[in-house]
Amino acid sequence: MAAQLGLVLDCVDPDKLAVFWSVAIGYTTRGRAGTYVLLVDETGRQPKLLLQRVTEPKAGKNRMHFDIETPTVDEEVARLEALGAQRLEALPVEEHGNRWVVMVDPEGNEFCVCNAGQAG
C-alpha cells in the first residue's frame, strides 16, 4: 500500500475541536483513544485528521495551516463563524486573482477560507 497523508492537530480540548472540525469540513468522528480523537472523511479521499490533547495552549503562528476551498467564500466564512471560528483580518485578502479570509478555530489555530482551486 502506498503511503498516505494524515494530519495531527495539537489542542487542549480535542472533543470540542472534534465537534467544530467535523461540522466545518464534513468529517465523521471515527474513534477516541486516550488523548486522541480521530476524524475521517467517509469517502476516503481526504486525509485523516487526528486531534491530540496537549497540556500547553497554542503559542505563536502555525507553521502549517488548512485551506478550506469553496466557490462561496463569504457564505462559508459566515457558516464557520456561526460554528465558533473567528476572522483574524476584517477584510478578505485579494492577490493575483485569488481571494481568501484568514480565520482561527475555537482554540486559535489559523486556517484560510479561499476560492475553490485557489489555495493560498
Regions found by a protein language model. Give the residues of each.
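Vicinal oxygen chelate
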Residues: A2-V12, V23, G31, V37-V40, E56-L80, R99-V104, ...
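Short alpha-helical
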Residues: K16, Q46, E75
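Hydrophobic ligand-binding cavity/cleft-lining segments
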Residues: V12-F20
